[in-house]
């Protein structure tokens, strides 16, 4: 008798409000803005269809498979408070739609063609629930927070970093000199800027050699383990791996990758190499704002953060919170928890749409970087806690006396904040006072405080939540 050809509404097949989600389903929360005249159920069902088994018309080959087994389902829709004609559509995807251990495949399905769909004005993926049945197919971060602390032999405080500036234009030897001065002054890490790859003024191999020399000299003089994030990002995966192999041969502790511009396939390969060879992996999120900055369209950074934890990285940049609005603080801390913790409860006030259970997947250390300086240290220590990397680029290299004193100032400020916290003092209220006290016995810190004192230090008490 053939089959019933023709176009039918998506909602007849893909909108299933009675569906009970399974523990193995991947769940997605989409912010959907339908075109005028498109009902929300149809829009939500269209998203479920286009990101799973559907196409625009009924096809004969539908009869050769079980759609009920493989289709995505829009199982709940709620209006967004304060927005006209905008909805959160919840979609459940059967686990078998996805290749094991492939973030690339997961994103190709969930945020693929559907984002160009005409029936929608805009579409944003707000959150994903990754079931243990899927996350267990990933290696995840090469080492994780605890193993990193053991490798570095550094406990009970945040780690300190610095991005070498000017980011482009230095020769390899001068670059290595800046690395040495910062590490010698008291930082734990220095960092290649995300766009330092292998340019005519400084080829990657020369940079790696001079930076390794700087690391070993600083280690010998301070008795502390030091690292420099050697950026292995390259134009091909083969070239990227070549750089990572060379870093391992030099014996340095950590390499770096730009995971969005480099791509998830390259990143996952590099993360697996890093675990097999004892390298830590620092991840920069260049290009994230292209994807996550628009409120109505794209993908929230918390989804990119979850994807990175699956693909693999030991550190990832996660914003600074300082000086931003209170609401953003809560949302940032939400995805910081998604990066670090094993089990994260659903909490809509922090932007967490689903309870996420990572089981035993190692955690990722969030990196606070961008426009921060010594006066921010109490706030950063309070907000991010010990398992974080605080990165001061200009806040180190901009010190009036030079790089090493800039590093000293940051280290003194950090140690003062950690000590004050451990003594039970309230960093939120006494932050400025703690920094002032410390600067009395550190001329380097006093000079840094003087330079950046104009920059406002507003840190409202945390108990106003």
UniProtKB/Swiss-Prot annotation:
GO MF term set: magnesium ion binding; monooxygenase activity; ribulose-bisphosphate carboxylase activity
Q: How is it modified after translation?
A: The disulfide bond which can form in the large chain dimeric partners within the hexadecamer appears to be associated with oxidative stress and protein turnover.
* GO CC aspect terms: chloroplast
Chain residues that bind Mg(2+): 191, 193-194
State where the protein is found.
Answer: Plastid, Chloroplast
UniProt cross-references to InterPro entries, sorted A to Z: RuBisCO, RuBisCo_large_chain_AS, RuBisCO_lsu_C, RuBisCO_lsu_C_sf, RuBisCO_lsu_fd_N, RuBisCO_lsu_N_sf, RuBisCO_lsuI
Matching entries from PROSITE patterns are given as: RUBISCO_LARGE (PS00157)
Enzyme category, top tier: lyase
- BP GO terms, sorted: photorespiration; reductive pentose-phosphate cycle
**Family listed:** Belongs to the RuBisCO large chain family. Type I subfamily.
- What NCBIfam families does the database record attribute to this sequence? PRK04208.1
Miscellaneous note of the record? The basic functional RuBisCO is composed of a large chain homodimer in a 'head-to-tail' conformation. In form I RuBisCO this homodimer is arranged in a barrel-like tetramer with the small subunits forming a tetrameric 'cap' on each end of the 'barrel'.
Q: By what name is this protein known?
A: Ribulose bisphosphate carboxylase large chain
Question: From which source organism is this entry?
Answer: Byrsonima crassifolia (Cajuil cimarron)
